[in-house]
Amino acid sequence: MSGAAKQAMFAQRQIIVEQQMRYFAAGICGLIAIFVILHWTRALYSRISRTSSSPIPFAAPFSAVTRATRRLLIRKVPRFNSGGHALLVAAYVGINAAVCFTNVDLTSAGNVAARFGWMTTANMCFVVFLALKNTPLAFLTAYSYERLNCLHQISGCLTFVCMVIHAACYTAFFMGKNQRALLVEKEQIAAIVAGFAFLSVTISALVIRPIWYELFYVVHICFFIVGIVCACFHQPDFGKKIVIILILTAAMWFTDRVIRAARALYYLPNNSATVHPLPHGGTKIVMKKVPTRADGGKHFFVWIPRIRAFEMHPFTVVGTQPLEFIVKSHDGFTRDLHKYAAAHPGATLSASVDGPYGTFPDPIHYDKIVLIAGGGGASFTFGLAVNALERMKEGSNTEIVFIWTVKQHDNLAWFTQHLETLRTANSPGIVNMNLYVTRAPVSPPDLIPHRHTDEQGTGHPGHDRTVTMSSTSTSSAVNSPFSPTGADVDKYPVKEKSTTLPPITHPRSTLSSDIEKEMEQRVEDATAAAVSATAGTRTSVIVANPPERHTDSDSERPRRQHKMTAGRPDLGTLIREAVQSTPRNQRVLVASCGPQSLMTVVRDTTAGLVRADGPAVELHCEQFGW
């Protein structure tokens, strides 16, 4: 082929590939537009239905179609968070396949390599867009960056596959043409370095991330920077326009970093974090400053230079007056933070935050809020509950059903103050607490065992809620990840015993981290006595409430008690009871945070409750993503 013919061929290929990139951009933008339209249509419909006193025309067919669709899409499917996630990934992969294999000469390795090189660049731009912490999609679609992480990982892997095909085809093409010398040119050396850099990025995400998150983060960021710079040197010609896409990609990433750094520096002066150790590796962080737009349930990236000078870690807001985080110790930063808090309880450290981040339905717009948490996931549900209570108007009939499962009794100490806040909240809403301890062979000092209600309905005077607690829960059989224990206990006659243990003696106004320390100590001191007193018996328990400083208004308000049950909850039944007891003209929010097994039960159960003849049900799952 002559030089002129070759130039004409390259020019024609450039025109075709640029047109294919426009198709790719149109496909991705169309995918985003679907979510934008659906989000704002549902938001507008919900707003009109809340404010309108008369039926909305065509509302019934619209509601029936959307609910039938959501009933299918929010269910858990293997390898994906939900059916909706799987459908989104399938659409994204389909767009890539269509752009890769249309209008291309598949018999020429050079043409195939060029097409996949362009697709690598285009997908890399999309990968970075999905990773932006300050993403516009959080406003346009109500999906913030952590909820986009699933697609970010899929698109990252697909980008790497495109890069490998690009490199393999061009290598085969040059070797077949006996042009090995081209492989040692500086542009190709830059490409080889970029390839290994992106290989390191991919390995860090797939292999290192589940094992050592901090190492993953450092490798991910450093090798991404190396890869993007080397890719620019690989295609430096602005006429080919690839470098323009790469510069745009780098600019997006850099701008997001500048915004985050500026926000952290803005909140740094005169700011500090007070750290308190909690039982079983927990740490409480209390910030001096409360940033604007801080709401319970959202999360901030916390920077404590004394623990890690160059790291910021995301934690969920539990309370905003003051700004408070509850941190579970794993390894790295959280482990060192807990060690420091244990060695210096109540220490004050210079700190700052970046945020808030996270999107979820506004709880104030629902008639019933069902919150389910497992272990440390209660940081989200406590934050959401307090968020709703603080904003409820006088006369509101909103009900909050709070379900929390923990492994140990003293895990409850992590949220002692917040449990007390929900119990004594001067709010028109109703808070129905359901606490479950899965490893609870004995009653802790904060539980006062008392005689179970008899068949005539007589119970412990002065208490409005009781629940049966089986002290043999540690050996109970479990049919599902969250099935109840001791279900057949009432079939057999058992001997009842009553043992009174000292309640918390702190007044409400002095509840602090000392409560957690005292609770942990009393649990250890009382264990032996409680085992002998409760072994083999059935015991109803209530949480002993600390004495309070009462006012006239306090004395008129009935005291709430927290339901406490040993064993795993039957989440499916609890959720169904909460939703099915709601009138069909009302709205229910089901929000959960916890391990994958819990989230699967919540998803599948809630999906079955999304019906045309039932209340409007909204599901929000706050997945562990870090």
Model regions and ranges:
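Classical protein tyrosine phosphatase
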Residues: 117-118, 146-166, 374-403
